[in-house]
Amino acid sequence: MDGSSLFSFIEAGSSDLYVVPRYKTAFVNPFTEIPSLDILCSYFDKDGNPLESAPDYILKKAHKSFQETTGMKFEAMGELEYYVIFEREPLFPAQDQKGYHESTPFVKWDELRTEAMMAIAQSGGKIKYGHSEVGNFSVGDTDYEQNEIEFLPTNVEDSADQLIKAKWIIRTLAAHYGVEVTFAPKITV
């Protein structure tokens, strides 16, 4: 495969890569009418060596180094915060910088979050819980509603895979709902 189409820092002249599925990441796509299996992949150079600059390989090396240096296991607990961006609704508007663990009708996108959590769990994600967050704000006629999905601790590589799948699921659901999402951590001051 042409690696320059995957990673902007790879030059087209030396961009031959192999994309190899990591079968333990396989999950049934929750959005297709005909069941299909989706799989995360790792990247290898033309000689079959792991691509040094691939994010999953960097994490794998860091994890191994941590274990060798400390003798400890490295687990992570992802907290995926995101904003749903939508046209303001007149009834029960959210208040700026309020809404922590709020419920409907003040939170507009709890259904999207709940659907996302179900799809993430079905794809192998280990979820602790989800809730609305405090970072709500408005600009003109546009509202930004902050939500969070928190994961249970697991080894750092599996935790990263869960977050990759979760972001894809949330973006796909947002497209189905006709809204935008951003995973920017804080977009107001």
Task: List the predicted regions and their residue ranges.
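ATP/Mg2+-dependent ligation/transfer catalytic cores
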Residues: 1-137, 154-168
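Beta-rich nucleic-acid/ligand-interaction surfaces
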Residues: 84-85, 136-148, 183-189
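Conserved PLP-binding active-site segment of the aspartate aminotransferase-like
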Residues: 149-153
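Acidic, glycine-rich loop-and-beta core segments that form the ion-binding/anion-interacting portion
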Residues: 159-189
